Amino acid sequence: MTLRLHALITGAALFLLSFGGSALADGIATPWQMNFQEAASPVMERIEDFHNLLFWIITIITLFVLILLIYVIVKFNEKANPVPSKTTHNTFIEVVWTVVPIIILVVIAVPSFKLLFFQDKYENPDMTLKVVGHQWYWSYKYPDQGDFGFDSQMVQAEDLKPGQPRLLTVDNTVVLPIDTNIRVLQTADDVIHNWAMPAFGLKLDAV
């Protein structure tokens, strides 16, 4: 299958793509973690900023709806309001609940599109990494290094050493230089595979 260019990663501290060993403890999720991993790229930093913006918008909307529901339950229950209102419409309220959501969507859309366009920016690569997905392992090649390559397979649970994370430890890890722009050519040998680096805000389907 022909390799396709899926991503151009600009990394300030890209060290490895697969996890294995205690030295990687800071690069994986931790028990009861409530937030993202520490951002390792400008893209992930912007994703976090956008996530935080959405979090506060959603929180405010949720609290407003909750307060409104409580108010309606208390004020318009049968005991407090034995004679129900026969009001059919309220122009002001209808305008408000139309205009306010539009404003909220615009506030969300502007940074969202900025983030999308920012993710499409790239610089000329300093080196290339070929990634091929298989059932159930990855193959990596370094075209700039004489097409050197190897397979990277997950270490089974019974073979894990103390401190090695389950489902994240592999027998051969990918090592890349820091402060280097790296182009990733990605494809799959059989079915669709997903290749991800959460700290870099990167998640791609290998086809």
Which residues does each predicted region cover?
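Hydrophobic membrane-targeting signal helices
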Residues: 15-20, 69, 106-112
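Alpha-helical transmembrane segments
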Residues: 62-75
